[in-house]
């Protein structure tokens, strides 16, 4: 935990990000082939710009990011390509999100167990920096303001059935 991240007992435990400079770093990097990132979140503010939530950053070219993009929609971004969710994220509301990408580049975003976006993303650059939760230390002003109680990384592209199963396993905890 770095800077403005606090732990709360709310909903059986959650990380609370201040939206200023707080983030969590993990040595766990995304696979360069198949992967999924799953997390539960509650955003405290709407954004007119970008709030980075999860991702591997790179000193060289490229990055892999999952964020809240302009107009408060989820986005999966890899090396200049992106897919954007259709659902507008409301403040003060809990959501379960899953981002997937398979080795052929097919990417999907699931929100509360339902597919919210699909498309093709470029290849993943091998990470030379840490996986970050709650912010992007290579850019300024892109910090998450809200709560993230659960974050999981998989070395496979979860199926629609698996994304729904994981949502169903968490929905009562967060009133989804």
Segments predicted by a language model, with ranges:
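Extended recognition patches within non-cytosolic domains
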Residues: 10, 108, 114-115, 147-176
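Extracellular glycan-interaction patches encoded by glycine-rich segments
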Residues: 77-84, 127-149, 153
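Low-complexity, glycine/proline/serine-rich flexible segments
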Residues: 1-32, 73, 127-129, 168
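Extracellular glycan-recognition modules
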Residues: 17-75, 101-107, 141-142, 153-164
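Short, solvent-exposed beta-strand-to-loop segments that form ligand-recognition rims
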Residues: 87, 111-131
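Short strand-turn-strand beta-turns centered on an Asx-Gly dipeptide
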Residues: 79-80, 102, 110-113
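Short, aromatic/His-centered strand-loop micro-motif at the edge of beta-sheets
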Residues: 73-96
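Beta-strand-rich interaction surfaces with strong enrichment in secreted/lumenal proteins
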Residues: 25-28, 84-89, 120-122
């Amino acid at each position: 935990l770095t800077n403005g991240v606090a732990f709360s007992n709310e909903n059986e435990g959650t990380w609370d990000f201040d939206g200023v400079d707080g983030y969590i770093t993990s040595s766990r990097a995304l696979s360069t082939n198949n992967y999924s990132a799953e997390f539960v979140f509650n955003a405290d503010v709407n954004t007119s710009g970008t709030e980075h939530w999860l991702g591997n950053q790179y000193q060289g070219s490229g990055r892999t990011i999952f964020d809240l993009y302009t107009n408060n929609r989820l986005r999966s971004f890899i090396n200049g390509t992106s897919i954007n969710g259709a659902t507008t994220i409301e403040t003060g509301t809990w959501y379960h999100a899953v981002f997937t990408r398979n080795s052929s580049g097919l990417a999907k975003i699931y929100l509360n167990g339902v597919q919210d976006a699909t498309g093709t993303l470029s290849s993943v650059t091998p990470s030379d920096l840490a996986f970050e939760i709650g912010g992007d230390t290579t850019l300024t002003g892109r910090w998450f303001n809200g709560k993230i109680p659960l974050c999981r990384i998989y070395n496979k592209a979860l199926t629609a059935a698996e994304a729904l199963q994981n949502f169903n396993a968490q929905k009562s905890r967060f009133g989804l």
